[in-house]
Amino acid sequence: MIRTFQSKINYSKSSEDVDPILVEIIRNSLNSAAEQMKRSLIRTAFSPIIYEVLDFASAIYDKNFCMLSQSPSLPGFMGTLSFCVEASVKEVGGEENLNEGDIILYNNPYGSGSHSQDAAIVMPVFINKNKLIGYTAIKAHWLDTGGKEPYSTDTVDVFQEGTIYPGLKLYKKGKLVEDVYKLIVANSRVPKAIIGDLNAQLNGVKAGARALQRIVNKYGFETFEQSVIKIYEYGEKLVRKTISKIPDGEYSGWGQMDSNGVDKGVVKFKIKINVNGSDLELDFSEAPVQQNGPINCPLPSTVSKARVAFSMMAGNGEQPNEGFFRPLVIKTKQGTMFDPVSPAPCFLNGWAGLQVIEIIYKILSEKIPNVFPASSGGCLAAAVWWGKGENNNEPWADGSPHPIGQGAFNGGDGITSMHHNSAGTRISPTEIWESRNPWLVNKIELAKDSCGAGKYRGGLGLNLEFEMLEETYVTTVVERTNFPPWGVNNGKAARSNNVILNTKNGKLNVPKKTGLKLNKGESIIFKTGGGGGYGDPIERSNKKILNDLKQEYISKEYVEKHYPQFKKTKE
C-alpha cells in the first residue's frame, strides 16, 4: 500500500493583524523555553550519553501536535517527537483522558520513529486547570531497556530490541504511578542510570510546561494562537523560498548500506525527488522490502530524516517549527525498508536515516551546482560498551559515538572531527570515559590523509584506540566501510570508516558486530571517515597545501598524488 504524509497544519490567515514585533517576542520565548528544557536535562542527567554526548531532543508542541519549537540538540529527532506526542495521547484514550499533572512514557519504535532505547516523556500543559494549550516532550537515549544486549546490530524482530512502553501514564494528576516505575526498574541492566536520566527528563518537561504557561498567561491565549499561525507561516516561507530555486522536475539517486546486520551483502535503495514550484515530494516507494536485520526505518523516522535534510538546507539558521515541514510530502510503500510493518527489527534505523540525508543532497548537488557539500564520513562510528563491573560487582554500560570529517563545500574546507551533520552529538572528554569505565584511551588523533582532496579539502576523521582494563563487551555500529565518502564537482573521495579488534591472536575488522568480548589488555581501534573534497584538486592554492603539510593534516605522498601543481617555497 502506498502512503503519503504531510504536516497536519491546516491554518487560514489569522483573522486579526498581529504586531510582528510581538510575534517575534513570542517565537523567541518559545525557543528559549525549549532551550530551558535542554539545559535542565543536561544539568541533572545521570549518564554522559545525555549530558556530554547530547543524545536527546526537547520540544514544545501545540494542542494539535504541531511543533512550536525544538532545542538545537539532536536534529535526527526532528519530527519524530510529534509522532511520539500524538501516539502517546492516543494510547491513553485521547485528549479527554488527560488531566493536569499527567505525564506519559512512550518508546514504541513504530510510533516514535526511534529505537526502543530512545524514551519519550510527554507532558500535557494546561491553563485555568482544564484548558489544554499544548505539550512538552523530551526524548532521550536510555543506556539499556532490557533487549538481548544493551545495543544490537543483529536483531530479527522488535521484541529483541528492548522493553516497549506503549504510552503509559507515569504520573496521574501529579502522582507517581508506582507500578509503571517498578516496571522500568525491573527491565534494565543499569536501573540507577535509567532512573537518574528519567528524573532529569521529568524535570525538563516540567520546566518547559511552566515556561509555556507563562507565555500564554502573559499574552493571552487568543493572541498566542494568532502569533503561532504567523510563526508557522514564517517557517513555511523560508523553506518554500529555497525549494522554489530548484528547477521543476523529477530527480533520483541511489544510496546503500554495508549490510542489514543479519544477512550478508550491500542493501541498495532508491530515492526520488519531485519538485513542483515550492512543493516537494520525497518518494521512498521504490525502496527494497523490509529487511531481516534492524536497518528498517518506521514511517516517523523516514519523515524525520526528510525534515532534517530540508530544514538544514533552507532554515537559514533558524530553530525549526512546524511551518518548515508544510511544503514537504513524503511518499512510502508499506512493507518496505522505509515503511516497515511491525515486528520488523528497526534498532539501527538511525544509521539508514543518516544515509538518506546525504543521498538527498547528492541527488540535488548534481542538478544545482555550488550549493550542496560533499559527503561526510557518513556515520556516527559508534560503540556501546558494557560489563559486569569487576571492581564493585555492579553492571555498567556506556556509549561513545566518534566524530568524522565533514564534506567540503563551495567556499571552504570541511570541518574536521565533528559528528554527522544530522546527529548534533559530541564526543565525551577522555577524563569522563576513563573515570567511569574500565578502559584507557591510548590514542585520539586526527587521521592524516583521511580527507578527500579538492579545491577545498574535506575534514579529517579520527584514529582512536581503547585498551581494556577488565573483561568488557562492545557492540560496534559503523557504516560506510564498503564505499568511500564522495566528492562533489570533481572533488576526490575520502577515507572510509573502519573498526579493528586488536587481540593477542591478531587483528580483525569488526565494523558492525554485537557483543564482542574484549579481554583485559586487548584493544579496539576506530578509524573514522573523512569528508569528501569539493572542486578540482588542481585548483587548490599553494598556500593552503603548504599549511596542511605544516599542520600534518596531509603527507608529502598525499600531495604528490593529489596536488601535482604544488611548488615548494621557502618558509
What are these regions (language model features)?
Residues 2-100, 105-128, 132-281, 285-570:
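Glycine/proline-enriched, intrinsically flexible loops and inter-domain linkers
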